[in-house]
C-alpha cells in the first residue's frame, strides 16, 4: 500500500503548517512507515493511506514519486 506522509524537516522545532512537506512511501502498515523512516530526523505529523480514487488523484501530481526504502 502507498502512504502519504506529512512531516516537518526539523524534529526539534515547533511544527508550522507552512513548512509541512510530504512524501510518498510504500509499506505494509502505518507502523511499517514509521519503522522505515525512523533513521531520519523528521517530525511526522500524519500518515495517510492512499487507495482507489484518492491514489489516482495523487498520481496526477508532478510531485508524486514513491520513496523506496528496503525493509
Curated annotation (Swiss-Prot):
Gene Ontology cellular-component annotations: DNA-directed RNA polymerase complex
Key word Repeat present: no
GO MF annotations, alphabetized: DNA binding; DNA-directed RNA polymerase activity
EC nos: 2.7.7.6
Signal peptide interval: none
Example GO biological process: DNA-templated transcription
Pfam family, one: RpoY
Keywords: DNA-directed RNA polymerase, Nucleotidyltransferase, Transcription, Transferase
Catalysed reactions, as listed in the record: RNA(n) + a ribonucleoside 5'-triphosphate = RNA(n+1) + diphosphate
Family: Belongs to the RNA polymerase subunit epsilon family.
Oligomeric and partner information: RNAP is composed of a core of 2 alpha, a beta and a beta' subunit. The core is associated with a delta subunit, and at least one of epsilon or omega. When a sigma factor is associated with the core the holoenzyme is formed, which can initiate transcription.
NCBIfam families: PRK13667.1
Protein name, as recorded: DNA-directed RNA polymerase subunit epsilon
Lineage: Bacteria, Bacillati, Bacillota, Bacilli, Bacillales
Amino acid at each position: 500500500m502507498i502512504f502519504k506522509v506529512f512531516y516537518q524537516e526539523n524534529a526539534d522545532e515547533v511544527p508550522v503548517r507552512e513548512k509541512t512537506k510530504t512524501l510518498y512511501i510504500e509499506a505494509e502498515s502505518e507502523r511499517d512507515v514509521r519503522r522505515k523512516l525512523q533513521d531520519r530526523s523528521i517530525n511526522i505529523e500524519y500518515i495517510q493511506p492512499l487507495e482507489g480514487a484518492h491514489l489516482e488523484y495523487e498520481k496526477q501530481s508532478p510531485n508524486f514519486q514513491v520513496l523506496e526504502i528496503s525493509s
